[in-house]
C-alpha cells in the first residue's frame, strides 16, 4: 500500500547545519491516497529516489545507483542518522565502494527501503518480515512505525505502516506520555533522557490542521519514539519566536532554559563502578576549595539562563554562591533564603539541579552526557520537603512543610502560541520533592468535595520506625470540589533517584503515577476539604509527636516469675547490685552461714525478689572464702606457737635424755641424744622440698601409698619394738620398778608392756632404793586417771584440752624430733572410728611409756614428795577433785607431768635424772593449777588437745580389781590430733609453695623425689607413725 506523507514538521525549523537537519527528519503517516501537504524528505534521502526510480526489485540496476559510500558505510556499522554528502545538481556521483548489503539477509538489497527513525537501508521484504517480530532497526535498535520505500522524489514516496497486535487503549491524546532519548552525535545534549508531556504538542498540531497520531500507533512505539528528533523539534519550536534564543550564546544554555521552563528535574547520577556519590557538605568545600571551582562553570551557565531578563547582576549572584558554598549546606534553609531574592520561585528547582551535579562524579561535560530528567506537569500543587529535612534535623519536635501553588501564568509566560498549554484543566497534580532524603513513602488520597479520610504516609527506616501525625487542610473552589474522587499514590519507584511524583487525572478516569519520594519520618496525613471558594489551595501541616515515655517501647521483656505482664529490665538490673553490696556489708559471718537455708526457695511474686534467689552461688563462694580464712588463721597461730617452742627448748641445760615416748626411742648416752637431735634438725628442709615434688603426683597414687604404709606400720610396730630391744647392746629404756608395794596399776601397765614386747619384765635401774617412793607416785597417778575417766563418762562432756607451757629458763633438753602442727578437729564419724582403734591398739605402749616416765622421775628425785605440797584448798570446789585432798594433789601433779610429757615431746627434759628439772616443773604446775576453773577453760580453748572419751578395756579391768582405773589413753589421742594437724598444715603450706615455685624446678625435683621416697620408705617402716601423712615426718636413725 502506497501512502503519501503530507506533513512538514521540519519545514519551519531554523537552519542548524546540514548534518543536524539531515538526521532530524520525522516521517509522520498521512492520509491514505493524499499527496497534498505531504512532508518533504531530507536531502540525504534523495539517494533512495535515484535508486528506486525504476521500482525494480531484482536489483539489476544497483550498479548504477549514485550512492555515496561514506554514509552507507557509516550506516552499515550502525551509526544512526549520519548525514550523507549532498548530491550534485545533475544527480550523478561516482561511488568509491560497493553499496552495503542488507543486514537481515546479508545479500544485495532488493527494493531498498529505510525506517522512519533512521536511514539504515534494508530489503523491503526483509524489513517487513522483521517488523512483524519486533519493530526495531536491526542495526541501531531504534523502534519504528513505518517503512519508507519506493522513493521517487523528496516529496513523492510510499509508506508501509508496521502491523501491531497490541490492544488499543482508550483514546486520550491529551494525556499521552512517551520517552525520548537523544542520540550521541547531537551537539546540544548527548544521551540525555527525558520524559516529555506532549499534551501541548498534540493540541498545537490539531490547531494547525495536522493529524494526531492514533492510539494504536502510540501503543506500538510512541513511548520510545525517536530519541532526539521529537524533542529537538519541540525545543526549536519552543524558542523559535524568542529573540533571546538566537543570542543565548550556545545550545547548552538554550537547553538549560528549556529544563527550567519545562520543569524537568534531574535524577541522581552516581559512580557507575562503585555506585557512590561525591561529598557535598560545607565542611568538605571549606577543606577543599578546589572543588568549588568545579561547580562554578555549571552555576554560571544556569544563573545566566535564569537571570537573562532580570535586573540582578550575574556577578553578584556568583559572588554570593562562592561565599555560601563553604559556609552553608546546599539543602539548608539559609542557602535557600539567601538565593530566594534573586531566583524567586525557581530557587528550589535550581537547588535541586545544583545538588545533583555537586554530588555526581563527573564534570560539566560528562554530567550532560549521562544525566536523566523527570518531567513535572505545568499546573500543580507542590509540596516541598526540603525544609522539612533541615528542620527535622535541627529540631526533632517540629516539622515544617512548605506548600506552594505554582502559577500557571508564570509557567507559561515564555511559551509561544503554538506551544501554549490548555487553559482549563480538570485534574490536580501533587508533586512531592525531597532530593536529600533516603527513604520512601506512599500516599493515597481521595476527595469528593466533602470531608475526606485523608492521606496516609508510612515509611520504615533501617534503624527504626517513627510515627508522625500531620493534619492537612485544603480548601478548594466549588467547581473542583464537585468533581469525582481522585487517588494520588506516591510510591517508591526509585528510592535512590529522589524522583518526583506526579498524578494527573481527568474528569472521568483515575490514574496513578509512581516515582521515588521520601520522608525522614513515618507520617500520617489527614486531608480536610471545605467547599468554601478561594483563588488558591491552602495546605496546612501540623506536626504532633508523642513524648518518649508515651511511645510504644521497642523491646518488651516478660518475666514468668512476676505477677505483672511487663517488667522493666533496666530497673531490675540496677537495683540488684545495690542490694547485693548492701547485704555483703551488713551481714555477719553467722548470717552468711545461715543464708544458705533460703537459697532454693520458690519463685517470688515480684521481679526483684525473684532475682535475689539467683545469688546462691555468690553466697556459697562467700562461705567457702570465710572457711579458708579461718583455716589460715588457725594455721598461722599454730605456726607461731611451734616457732616459739624450739626457741624455748634451746635454752635448756640438760644435755642428755634417757626417757622414751610413743614417738621415738632414744639412747641413754649423751652422744646418741646429740646425734639424734642433729639428724632430726636436717630432715625438715629435705622433706619440704620432697613434698612439693610429691604434690605433682595424682592423689590416688599418694592415697594408695599412705594406706599401705599405715598397714605396715601397724603390723610391724610391735615387732620393731621387740627387735630393737634385742639388737641394742646398751639398754634403750629403763625397766619398770617391781617393788612389793601396792602399786597395782603401774605393775599392770608394766606387765602389759612386757607381754606386748615378748620380753620378761626385769629391773636394771641402779637406784633401787627409791622404788617405794616410785610405787606410791604411780599409784597416785593411776587414781587420777580413774577419776578423770569416770568424770568424763558421767558428765558426757567434751574432752579437756591440756597443754603445758614452761618458762624459758625452766625448759631443758635438746630437740629430739621435728615439731608438727596441731590439726583442726575432725568431726566426721568415718574418721573418728579408725583413730580410736589406733589409740586402743597402742594403749599398752602408752602404759609402758607412762611407767618409764614415772620410774625415771622417781629415780632422779632425791627430795621427798613433800615438794608437791601446794595448796589444795583452792581446788575444793573443783568437780574433778575426789577423795583425800593431799593424795589428790599428788595424783594431779604426777598425772599432769606425764600428760605434759606426752603432748609436748620436745620437753622430754622434764623427766630426766636432774632433780632441778623436776622441781621446776612442779613449781610451774602449782602456778598453773592454782587458777580458777575459768582460767582452765580459757586455756583449754586456746590449746586444741583433747582426751579420748572412749572407754579403755584394760582400764575397766584394773578398776574392777583395784578400784582404780587404768591410765587414760591420752597418748594415742594426742598423737592422732598432732598428726592430723601436721597433715593439714603441711598440705596447705605445700599448696602455697607450689604456686610460688617455677615449673622447671618442679620437674627436676620430681626425679630427685622419686629416689628420696624409696629411701624414706625404709625409714618410715622403722618409725612409729600413726598419721595419714606419716611418710612426711622426720625419723631418728637407730
Swiss-Prot record:
SS bond partners: none
Residue numbers carrying Phosphoserine: 822
One cellular component term from this protein's GO annotations in UniProt: nucleus
A family per Pfam: zf-C3HC4
ZnF locations on chain (RING-type): 102-141
Catalyzed reaction equations: S-ubiquitinyl-[E2 ubiquitin-conjugating enzyme]-L-cysteine + [acceptor protein]-L-lysine = [E2 ubiquitin-conjugating enzyme]-L-cysteine + N(6)-ubiquitinyl-[acceptor protein]-L-lysine
InterPro entries: Znf_C3HC4_RING-type, Znf_RING, Znf_RING/FYVE/PHD, Znf_RING_CS
A GO molecular-function descriptor: ubiquitin protein ligase activity
Location in the cell: Nucleus; Chromosome
Protein known as: E3 ubiquitin-protein ligase Topors
Keywords attached to this entry: Chromatin regulator, Chromosome, Metal-binding, Nucleus, Phosphoprotein, Transcription, Transcription regulation, Transferase, Ubl conjugation pathway, Zinc, Zinc-finger
Principal EC category: transferase
UniProt keyword Transferase present: yes
Function of the molecule: Functions as a ubiquitin-protein E3 ligase. Negatively regulates the transcriptional repressor hairy/hry by promoting its ubiquitination and subsequent degradation. Also directs the nuclear organization of the gypsy chromatin insulator. Chromatin insulators are regulatory elements which establish independent domains of transcriptional activity within eukaryotic genomes. Insulators have two defining properties; they can block the communication between an enhancer and a promoter when placed between them, and can also buffer transgenes from position effect variegation (PEV).
Organism: Drosophila melanogaster (Fruit fly)
Any single GO BP term: regulation of DNA-templated transcription
Effect of substituting residue 102 to A: Abrogates ubiquitin-protein E3 ligase activity
Positions carrying Phosphothreonine: 820
Subunit structure: Interacts with hairy/hry, p53 and Top1. Interacts with the gypsy chromatin insulator complex, composed of Cp190, mod(mdg4) and su(Hw); interacts directly with mod(mdg4) and su(Hw). Interacts with Lam/lamin.
Residue spans of biased composition, Low complexity class: 643-668, 723-744, 841-858
Segments of this protein annotated with the region Disordered: 53-96, 627-858, 972-1038
